[in-house]
Design a protein with these regions (language model features):
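Accessory RNA 3′-end/elbow-binding domains used by RNA modification enzymes
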Residues: 1-11, 17-38, 42-45, 63, ...
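Active-site phosphate-binding and catalytic loops of NTP-dependent enzymes
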Residues: 29-35, 109-116
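Acidic, low-complexity central loop/insert segments
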Residues: 59-111
Length: 289
């Protein structure tokens, strides 16, 4: 049984759904799902669960993301990125000092209004489709967490590289647009690269072509991060040998461990356990065939 998480290096001009289709074909299974959409024109880390690893989705999808984004001042667009129609222009020049001074106001908990051109849905319809039809929707502003935000390079006149670590659901193009508003200069996101999604990082990412080459060499299993490693952020809890069968059958075992999720072991990794009121039960079965 082939299972685990593969970290795909998604190129620009390819949708996250297209990556899933390719991964299904390469690993020859329909049990595939990605851990967070990347816009088609964005690039970078796209973790994809394969086989039984899809059971870990709820425990991995909320992890922090890290991005490198190029912010361009002097023009805003209707999509807040370089693919949209220009909405406003300005000849104003933004300096490094001006940008650095405003960035701290965008760290911590901030409120974002998701762009109309997005994968979010309203009444079962994507905001993107509603935007194309020219329809308005109620304000869907929400809080997100910006853990860190800094300028890492100046790329030219009115163009800077930002590094952002943030919570799930943060729109970097909206962040770029809002930074422009704060400085009184229209801005948009010119390019986006996701460098990390939780524990899944750029240096462990493989292109679809590289995955296909590994398959041809009979080395496809090398491309997968195991379910055990993917759950390594959880504390470990070991059961005695006589509790193995009861645990596998869903029966609870008494424990002094604090309430919360854990990696449950009985010699081998069994899966994700849940401790509650002095008992632990196997919540996500990841052992055996």
């Amino acid at each position: 049984m082939i299972e685990g998480i593969v970290t795909v290096l998604k190129p620009p001009a390819m949708s996250s759904s297209d990556v899933v289709v390719d991964v299904r074909h390469i690993y020859e299974t329909r049990r595939v799902g990605h851990l967070g959409t990347l816009d088609p024109e964005a690039a970078g880390v796209l973790p994809v669960c394969v086989g039984r690893a899809v059971r870990l989705f709820d425990y991995l999808v909320d992890k922090q993301k890290t991005y490198l984004a190029e912010i361009a001042f002097g023009a805003s667009t209707d999509t807040q990125d370089a693919q949209g129609k220009v909405a406003e222009t300005s000849d104003a020049v933004v300096t490094e000092e001006q940008l650095d001074a405003v960035l701290p106001s965008f760290t911590g908990t901030i409120v974002q209004r998701p762009p109309m051109y997005s994968a979010l849905k309203f009444n079962g319809q994507k905001l993107y489709d509603l935007a194309l039809k020219g329809k308005e929707i109620p304000d869907k502003s929400r809080e997100v967490q910006i853990v860190s935000l800094k300028r890492t390079a100046t790329l030219g006149r009115n163009r800077f590289l930002l590094e952002i670590t943030c919570s799930r659901g943060t729109y970097i193009r909206t962040l770029c647009s809002d930074i422009g508003e704060a400085l009184g200069v229209p801005a948009h996101m010119a390019f986006l690269l996701r460098t990390a999604s939780g524990m899944f990082t750029l240096d462990r990412s493989l292109t679809v072509a590289e995955l296909e080459a590994k398959k041809a060499e009979g080395r496809l299993s090398e491309t997968l991060i195991s379910c055990e490693e993917a759950a390594s952020f959880l504390p470990r809890l070991d059961l005695k040998a006589d509790r193995r069968k009861p645990a596998m059958n869903g029966l609870p075992t008494r424990t002094n461990a604090p309430d919360g999720l854990c990696r449950l072991y009985c010699d081998d990794f069994l899966g994700v356990g849940a401790v509650q009121h002095g008992s632990v039960s196997l919540k996500v079965h990841l052992y055996g065939e």
